[in-house]
């Protein structure tokens, strides 16, 4: 994890079969679910299993939701992620609150990010 002037960046491995694809994601504790670009869902070969109503900076919208296998901070887990077009944005993935619960990560923006030692 890296703290930049504007956000916290996290290296996340996304798995398709056994080969991981690693991306730099933006940690977004205000997002209930992770969010990935459509191009990543195509690369991973995942299909939507439901839709969700999402509130974003662009207003309310419905988005497709997929299951993805991710790993960061040494823990691999399966989480839901919404699909969106992230062209022109810095990060192809937002790491939402749903990915933090199993990861034992504490975020204190004023000071640092702490991961529990195993």
Language model region names:
Residues 1-118:
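Pepsin/retropepsin-fold aspartyl endopeptidases
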